[in-house]
Amino acid sequence: TDALKEVIEPLEKSSEKITVSYIEEDSAEDGGFGYIPDRLPAIAIIDKEGKDHGMVIYGIPTAGLFRAFMRMIVMFSTGEHNLDDEMVEKINNMEKTELQVLVTPSTPKCDETVEIADSFAFCSEKVTCSVTELIEFPEIAERYEVLDVPKTIVDEDLKFTGSYDRSELLRIIEERISDVEE
């Protein structure tokens, strides 16, 4: 979309390290995703080796979501994810986990929540994180009965609203895994 290009093109022009590929809605081209996203517009950040870390934003990153998007770019460029070694080890020893973070652009705490969930996906192939901007995708808000944001969905079966810190998210995921195993 033109609105997405308005956000992304200045970033691409600002650094030769950023390359942008666009997927048109009716295209069979994957634009580097490795798959065709189920919702467009979508942004996947892929590292310089072409590796997809399982992080995608559905919608146009504006306001607070733009800050989270910029932090994703910094995470990719520096490799810094703000998780200590013990936490990374625990994340890598978990079952595969899919995180969906549902946000609106200007709601406080959404960008921090996105950054934490993204850091889990960045440091482990066992975690994916999709972020959906609900103003652009009201059908997703309806499907998950979202009344407040941020709302995080873990593997489609655990849904909780509000922000969290890194250790709290890890605890929630570990408890969900142990509940499923029992």
Where do the model's predicted regions map?
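Long, charged amphipathic helices and adjacent flexible linkers at domain junctions
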Residues: G79-N92
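Local sequence-structure signature of Cys/Sec-based thiol-disulfide redox active-site neighborhoods
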Residues: T1-S14, I91-E125
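Generic beta-strand/beta-sheet core signal
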Residues: I23, L102-T104, T132, D155
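Feature detects long, helix-prone N-terminal segments enriched in hydrophobes
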Residues: S27, D47, E89-I91, E182
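Thiol-based oxidoreductase modules, predominantly thioredoxin-like and allied folds used
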Residues: S15-A28, E125-E139
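Oxidative protein folding and maturation machinery
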Residues: T1-G31, L40-A42
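Structural micro-motif
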Residues: E29-H53, R143-D155
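Non-catalytic, surface beta->alpha helical segment in thiol-disulfide oxidoreductase systems
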Residues: I45-E80, I153-E182
